[in-house]
Amino acid sequence: MSPTAPLKAAVIGVGSMGQHHARVYTELEQTHLVGVADRDADRAEEIGTTYGVPAYADHRQLLEEERPDLVTVAVPTSLHLTVGTDALDSGAHILVEKPIAGTVADGQALIERARKTDRRLMVGHIVRFDPAIQALKHHVDEGELGRIFQIVCRRVGPFPARIRDVGVVVDLAPHDLDVMRFVSGDEPVRVYAETQQEIHTDHEDLLTGLIHFQGGPTGMLEINWLTPTKVRDVTVLGERGMFRVDSLTKDLFFYENAQANGEMWSALEVLKGVSEGRMVRYPLQRYEPLKAELEAFAQAVLDDEPVPVSGQDGLQALRLALALVESGKTHQVVEIGQGHESL
């Protein structure tokens, strides 16, 4: 039997991201916040006081006393399996911030636990809920680009002091790897990467990656923690032109290939090559991606429907990120689906 609205929601881990989950749960019609937990008791108390809910230093006490229907797991990646399992065993449906886990084995274990407890597991790939990415997906699905040739994602910026347990690839690449899969509807078959460790003491902090998809497109990925200004760009190149998303401004642009005509290029147009056509900036409805994400999570639970970003989606993004890390270390092309269950 599905629960009824408003659902009781809780947040475990109220750091830089978890605090916003707490806020949004107080704003949604489908949910009300019943408690927060954090190993930093002072931090938990601060957020609990802000939203007028109980605060706990031990997440297990929160789960036992508040019995939430929904739980956001926003703890460090290395704790996702432990905390997520505790929440599932308490009867809660969970949204785990990306990446789903630090290893494929942990991610698989979390998915299996959700299956055994018959609870929803959603992974917080928030970029899918960016209004510009949603619009991009719509236009690509409508065939407005024709065949897709290339997807390029650039996610660079300064080093976030909050990150300690993983490198830039596992922290940031799952966002864009998931976007590439989501927008293209295609699956990567091999990757190659060059990584560098310039400032971070334990992990790589720069990656340049190539991803080849089963259907033919090539993905290019540039991520780092070294750029003094933040850039979040996605471009999708196809036979009729190019879409570009600026995720910071939530803008979507289309640059037309003036030589593309109808379903096929004529022989004359092919000889002329590609030329600049019109540029369109699409008017988009602005909304907060996190609010859309949590709303979709809550609604899936209420409707007893699959969540929009499954545990398998999160696991595939993690597999690809770890394959990029491996390629960066070995300087070899890594085939996906061959020997990566243990990564």
Question: Where are the language model's segments positioned?
Answer:
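C-terminal capping/lid region of NAD(P)-dependent oxidoreductase domains
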Residues: 4, 119, 326-343
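N-terminal Rossmann-like dinucleotide-binding module
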Residues: 1-51
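A contiguous active-site-proximal alpha/beta segment in oxidoreductase catalytic domains
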Residues: 95, 101-163
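Beta-loop-alpha module in the N-terminal Rossmann-like domain of NAD(P)-dependent dehydrogenases
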Residues: 21, 51-113
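C-terminal glycine/acidic-rich active-site capping loop/insertion
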Residues: 126, 240-312, 334-343
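Rossmann-like dinucleotide-binding domain that binds NAD(P)(H)
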Residues: 160-229, 235, 249, 312
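Short, Asp-centered acidic motifs that coordinate Mg2+ and/or phosphate
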Residues: 35, 69-70, 150
